[in-house]
Amino acid sequence: MSMTVEIRVPNLDCEGCASKLRKTLLKLKGVEEVEVEMETQKVTARGYRLEEKKVLKAVRRAGKAAELWPYRLGNSHFASFYKYPSYVTNHYYSDAHRTDPTGGVHTFFHTPADYSVAVAGDEIAASMFSDDNPHACTIM
């Protein structure tokens, strides 16, 4: 029975980190294929009788933080994307004689309250490069 385990690995920045994770996961028993998508920070392991906990533990042993892939609706990254049937939605500008071009399904994006307001203020941006902040950016 072939299984797929999808993991989110934040801060997956360079090709060296990706190859290190690929080699680490290919050493696990049962892993046949490892796919690393750096732009989405996603690692997919496919194989025979894979256990999510063992794959997570192997990634963490390689020195990376890891969690199970939080977007369970296929490979869609739009977790806040909703579809409603046409009888639920309001037709503000529709004419009664026209047919519904959407096929009866209306979609929209729901923006969570956390992202609808600017989060970073001037103080936070200024303290990113401060010498007093131990977690500051090391570019300077």
Swiss-Prot record:
This protein's record includes keyword Coiled coil: no
Classification via InterPro entries: HMA_dom, HMA_dom_sf
One GO MF term attached to the UniProt entry: metal ion binding
Lipid-substituted positions (S-farnesyl cysteine): 137
Superkingdom, natural source: Eukaryota
Any matching Pfam family: HMA
Propeptide feature: residues: 138-140
Keyword field: Lipoprotein, Metal-binding, Methylation, Prenylation
Residues annotated as binding a metal cation: 14, 17
Residues covered by the HMA domain: 3-67
Cysteine methyl ester modifications at: 137
Role, per record: Heavy-metal-binding protein.
Family: Belongs to the HIPP family.
Protein name: Heavy metal-associated isoprenylated plant protein 31
Protein's gene: HIPP31
